[in-house]
Every structure is written in structure tokens, then in C-alpha cells.
Amino acid sequence: MKFSRDTIAVLKNFTSIYSGIMLKPGNTILTRSVTGASYGEAEINDTIDFEAAIYDLNGFLSILGLVTDQAEVSLAEDASNIIIKDQRSTIHWPAADPSTIVFPAKKIPFPVAKVIFDLKGSDLQQLLRVAGGLSLDTFAITNKDGKIVIHGYNQLEDKELARPLYSLVCGDYEGDAAFKFIINKLNMKMIPADYRVMLWAKDDKFATKFEGTQASYVIAMEQGSSHEFQD
């Protein structure tokens, strides 16, 4: 198989969630963080035709960047190495023991969302850039005055999240149930793009899905999140 630029871009992004990857036959790539707080999935145009674990994905991508775009990637007959081969060079990258990395066994099904809204890529970029400039470490997606709003906080200085340093209105909210979904900025590892954001909560369980055209992500919420949704 060949790795297209789009597939490489997804893999580079997934290194920010976890350092390794499990490649399986098909068109789906999955990853998750060690803590399980972040999960990513992507449907790629390339077709993976082998199964192999990569322990150091950044290193693998760096090596892949040294060969031409036409390089073929395959698995050795004894499954000990991943072979990268172009017109003139052949590179043998060691395949890892799958037990040495963490990876999702299958796609995570997301429950029916309680709240859905669209987040533009330009708004996401602004959100993250402002976070860097203001040292924001926490976001809260909530409802206020009939709107869905994302607040940004510096929780180190504002443990109760009472003083938002940044607010972004994302759309109208027609529901009656109040909610507050708290996200650790460190888990915001998405590729800059437009996303459909889905909020789900039941009892003391919370999750948010960022569904994009190139990749989708599910993020666990932080302590202090709350909701008034009814089953």
C-alpha cells in the first residue's frame, strides 16, 4: 500500500493522542490515549492491507518522509518488519509487539446526543490560539440565555471556574435542560477543521464527540461537569 498525504496528516495528528498505532486491514485508523480520556477515529482513502503495531509512530513517519510519495509499505513475510520501498531504497522498520502499545479494539459507538451544534474550523483555531495567549487550560460547553457557549478558563487560578476569560457563542439552544461539559484543553487534539459537536450525558457519565469529515474524536469530560437531562 501507499500512504497518501491525507493519511499521513491523520497519523501525525494521532501521535498527539498516543505515540503508537495499531494498523489493521481496511480503511479505518483508531487511536486512544493511555488514560482513555481521548479517542480518535478516521476513515482514510488508502486501504491498509496488513496488520502491524508501530511503537514509535513519529519515528516511523519521519522515516516515511525520507522516501518518495510512491513508496510501497508492506509487512515482511515473518511479520517482524514493516518494509518501506521506493524505486531505489528499501527500509525495514521493526514491527512492535501489540501488547506494548494501547489501542482501541474496535470503533466506539456514540450514544444518541442530547445536544448537537456545529463548530467552525476558524472558531476552533481561534479558541486554541486564545487559549495559548491567555493560558487557558479548561473549556466548558454550556447553555446561557438560549445560546450554546464555550467558555475558557485558567483553572489554576480559578478552581471554581467562576471567571471565564474567553467566551464563544456557537449557536442557538432550544432545550430547557441546563448543562456544563468541562473539557481539559490537553485533550483537544483535533485536526483544525469544521466539526459537528455532540454532547451526551446520563447520570454521572459524560462524553463529547467532535465529528469531522477527515477524523472524529470522543473526549471524556472532567470532574465538575453537570447536566439536567432527563432519560
Each predicted region: which residue ranges?
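DNA polymerase processivity clamps
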Residues: M1-P94, A113-D231
